[in-house]
């Protein structure tokens, strides 16, 4: 209809999260890998006091994010003492999505480069690249353990021209498949030349407790992304951060929007960092629940479930499961299963050729088990 809209947006599909809609039943929201617990009341009260006493809503937020950057650097060094990070190594975004977009602008926009991803993986890398007109090269993963097809990746790097691959995006652990980078993948990442940006998304670090932050000094072309949306319970406030060489940070700061992070979001992020030990104390419970769910789903012949290093599980249907669903394909069967669970009150995500189920509270997980067993 409008000829001024870029033609290459016609085939682009926007990221579409579930909508709770007007459902009258209790919904167990296990589709977006959030923490199942809200902030404690005492911290919410403290945030309310900060909002009332310290934040002037008629003033723009702190555009330098300096206090928040210093708090983030302190946290990174506490959990990874050998990282030796300072505020100069930190850039803050309105969620990690903004930082992904900024990294794409810094490296690839204007025909300067392509990006490489290994699917299935987090879809926003490709979506954001396409919105910027950046070519995306996808390689596969091994079906057994979802390890990156390194041979295919190397071939893509060597043969992709005009533009060549300038950035590689990996998640550690991967979403939706929940596997952490293994030794072969790490050897490959360490071997990549300095003229390729390596983006390691550690959104689920607090659950996996595996990080590459201590290697940043040896690999100045690496960037680590993290978020406050998962373990720190601030999904509604959209705070993410990048850890990288100061020169990369300087360029990220050049392309980000001014005043990109509201004062309330900055205050909340600083508050949760000051109470990180208490807030993260729920993680052992999530890991126990994950182990229970993995064992339970593994006993259902209709399901194939993979081990997880994150706060979610990934599964597909076996041949028996496909037969029970009465569909001709994995995709159709998974869509049908997802919809049946939704009508019963459990939201999960159908993505990457499988189903991704967030680990919820014990009660939510029990309801999910009962509903899945009721179907099979």
From Swiss-Prot:
Pathway: Amino-acid biosynthesis; L-histidine biosynthesis; L-histidine from 5-phospho-alpha-D-ribose 1-diphosphate: step 7/9. Its EC number is 2.6.1.9. Disulfide bonds: none annotated. It comes from the Bacteria. Its cofactor is pyridoxal 5'-phosphate. Pfam families: Aminotran_1_2. GO terms for molecular function: histidinol-phosphate transaminase activity; pyridoxal phosphate binding. The keyword Ribosomal protein does not apply. The modification N6-(pyridoxal phosphate)lysine is found at residue 230. One of its GO terms (biological process) is L-histidine biosynthetic process. InterPro entries: Aminotransferase_I/II_large, HisP_aminotrans, PyrdxlP-dep_Trfase, PyrdxlP-dep_Trfase_major, PyrdxlP-dep_Trfase_small. The keyword Transit peptide does not apply. PANTHER family: HISTIDINOL-PHOSPHATE AMINOTRANSFERASE, HISTIDINOL-PHOSPHATE AMINOTRANSFERASE-RELATED. Homodimer. Belongs to the class-II pyridoxal-phosphate-dependent aminotransferase family. Histidinol-phosphate aminotransferase subfamily. This is Histidinol-phosphate aminotransferase. It comes from Trichodesmium erythraeum (strain IMS101).
């Amino acid at each position: 209809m409008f000829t001024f809209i870029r033609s290459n947006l016609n085939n682009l599909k926007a990221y579409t999260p579930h909508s709770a809609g007007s459902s009258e039943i209790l919904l167990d929201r296990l589709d977006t890998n959030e923490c199942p617990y809200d902030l404690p009341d005492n911290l919410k009260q403290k945030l309310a006091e900060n909002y009332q006493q310290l934040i002037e809503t008629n003033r723009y937020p702190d555009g330098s994010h300096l206090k928040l950057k210093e708090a983030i650097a302190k946290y990174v060094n506490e959990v990874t003492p050998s990282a030796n990070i300072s505020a100069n190594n930190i850039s803050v975004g309105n969620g990690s999505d903004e930082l992904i977009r900024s990294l794409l602008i810094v490296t690839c926009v204007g025909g300067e480069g392509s990006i490489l991803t290994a699917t299935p993986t987090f879809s926003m890398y490709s979506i954001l690249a396409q919105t910027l007109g950046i070519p995306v090269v996808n390689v596969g993963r091994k079906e057994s353990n979802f390890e990156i097809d390194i041979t295919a990746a190397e071939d893509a790097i060597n043969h992709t021209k005009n533009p060549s691959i300038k950035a590689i995006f990996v998640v550690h652990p991967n979403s939706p498949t929940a596997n952490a980078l293994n030794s072969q993948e790490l050897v490959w990442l360490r071997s990549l030349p300095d003229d390729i940006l390596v983006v390691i998304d550690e959104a689920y670090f607090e659950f996996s407790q595996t990080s590459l932050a201590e290697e940043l000094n040896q690999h100045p072309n690496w960037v680590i992304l993290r978020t406050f949306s998962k373990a720190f319970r601030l999904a509604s406030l959209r705070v993410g951060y990048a850890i990288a060489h100061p020169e990369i940070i300087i360029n990220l700061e050049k392309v980000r929007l001014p005043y990109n992070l509201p004062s309330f979001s900055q205050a909340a992020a600083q508050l949760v960092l000051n109470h990180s030990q208490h807030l993260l104390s729920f993680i052992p419970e999530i890991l126990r629940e994950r182990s229970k769910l993995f064992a339970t789903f593994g006993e259902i012949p209709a399901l194939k479930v993979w081990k997880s290093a994150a706060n979610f599980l990934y599964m597909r249907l076996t041949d028996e499961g496909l037969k029970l669903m009465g569909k001709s394909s994995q995709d159709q069967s998974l869509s049908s299963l997802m919809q049946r669970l939704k009508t019963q009150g459990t939201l999960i995500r159908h993505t990457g050729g499988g189903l991704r189920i967030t680990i919820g509270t014990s009660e939510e997980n029990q309801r999910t088990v009962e509903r899945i067993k009721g179907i099979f």
